[in-house]
UniProtKB/Swiss-Prot annotation:
UniProt domain comment: There are two conserved domains in the glycosyltransferase region: the N-terminal domain (domain A, also called GT1 motif), which is probably involved in manganese coordination and substrate binding and the C-terminal domain (domain B, also called Gal/GalNAc-T motif), which is probably involved in catalytic reaction and UDP-Gal binding.
Protein task: Probable inactive glycosyltransferase required during spermatid development. May participate in protein loading into the acrosomes and accumulation of ubiquitin-proteasome systems around the head-tail coupling apparatus region.
Higher taxonomy: Eukaryota, Metazoa, Chordata, Craniata, Vertebrata
Positions of disulphide bridges: C105-C336, C327-C403
GO CC annotation terms, alphabetical: late endosome membrane
Subcellular location: Late endosome membrane
Tissue: Expressed in testis. Mainly expressed in the round and elongated spermatids during spermiogenesis, not in the outermost cells of the seminiferous tubules, which contain spermatogonia and somatic Sertoli cells. Present in the juxtanuclear space in the round spermatids, not in the acrosomal vesicles. In the elongating spermatids, localizes strongly in the acroplaxome, the region between the developing acrosome and nucleus. During differentiation, also weakly detected in the transient manchette containing microtubules.
UniProt protein name: Inactive polypeptide N-acetylgalactosaminyltransferase-like protein 5
Organism: Mus musculus
Amino acid sequence: MKSVIIQGLFCGFLAIGLWASMLLLFLHLEQEDMLENEKEELLKKRSLGKNAHQQTRHSEDVTHDEVNFSDPELIQGLRRYGLNAIMSRRLGIEREVPDSRDKICQQKHYPFNLPTASIIICFYNEEFNTLLRAVSSVVNLSPQHLLEEIILVDDMSEFDDLKDKLDYYLEIFRGKVKLIRNKKREGLIRSKMIGASRASGDILVFLDSHCEVNRVWLEPLLHAIAKDHKMVVCPIIDVINELTLDYMAAPIVRGAFDWNLNLRWDNVFAYELDGPEGPSTPIRSPAMTGGIFAINRHYFNELGQYDNGMDICGGENVELSLRIWMCGGQLFILPCSRVGYNSKALSQHRRANQSALSRNLLRVVHVWLDEYKGNFFLQRPSLTYVSCGNISERVELRKRLGCKSFQWYLDNIFPELEPFNTERKRKKNRF
C-alpha cells in the first residue's frame, strides 16, 4: 500500500513538472512570436536603400496630452531614465522632427564624394525607445554611401530590454549597426575610446544615446573636415524637452566655460552672421559639449584621444577643447547641422558622478591651465589639495604635440574669460 502511494505521488509530481515545463515553453514561444511579428512589421516600414534623406513617419499620430505630474508611472520614468518614458513609448522607435535649419542651409548642396562616417553612440541604462530613435534617425537621415557604420557601446546596462530584446531589434538595420558590450563598467569616456578603436570610417561622429538627428545633418560635418582634417566640428544642439519630448530649435550659439570649467552657451552676435554665408556661417567656438561632435579618425588618435585617467564623464569636453585649440587644431559649430538633445536634467546617473567629475576637472587644471589654475581653486577651494592621479602621460603628450600656452588660448581664442587676480589682469589694467 505504501509503495502504491509513493508511486502515485511520484507520478503526480512528474505530471506537474511536465505541465510546468510545457507552460514555460509555450510562454517562451509566444514571446518569440510576438517579437518576430513586431520585427516583421517594422521591417515593412523600413527600406535602408530608399529615402536616405527623408525620415519615415511613425505610423500612429502621437497626441501630446497634458503632463500629469501625479502619475506614478511618469515619476518612475523620470527617476529611472531622466525623461517621460510614457511619452517615449508612445512615440515608438522613430518619428519625424521639424526641420530647424535656416532657409539658406536648406538651399545648400554638398559634394557626393565625402569621407565616410562611423557613428559612435555609448549608452548605459538608456530608455529603450529613446535609444532606438537615436539609431533610427541616423539611419533614416544619413546618406547610405557615407554611413560606414553605427557603433553602439553598451556600458554594462542593467535593464532587461537592453539585452536580448535590443539584439533582436537591431536586426532591423540589416548589419549597419554594430553592438559592443563592455565586460565591466568603463564609464562614458572610456566607452567612447572603445567605440573609436573599433571604427573604420574616415570620420568619427560621437552622438549621445538620447538625441535625434535632423535633416542633412551629416553632410556639413563631413564637408568641413574634408577641407581641413584638423578641424573639429559640432552641430547646433536643438532641445528635446524631457517631459513632452517636443523638439524645439535652438538659437545659434558658441560653446564657452567659466572658471569652474562648467560649459555654457554664449550668444552669437548678429553682426557675426552678416557675411555672405549669413546664418549658415561656421562659428568659431572656444569649447564644445562632449557628447556630440565630429573629428577625423586619424587626427583623433594623433591628438591623444581622451584622457584615459578620467572616470565616467565630465570635464573631457573642456580638456579636448583646450587640446584642439592649443595644439594646432580648430573647433567650429556649424549652424547647418542640427541634432536634437534631451538633457535629462532629472537623471540619477548624472547626480551620482560628482566625485568623478571633480577628479576629471582637476586633471584638466593641472595639465592645461598653467599659471591660471589658481582661478579654478578660487571657485573650488575644497579641491585644492585633492589628488587627480598620475598626469605625467598627459603632460608628456602636451610637450610632444608642441602645444601653445593657456595664455595664448586666452589672448587669441577666449579673451572673454576674465581672470580674477593674475598678472594678465594687472597688465591689462595699466593701459
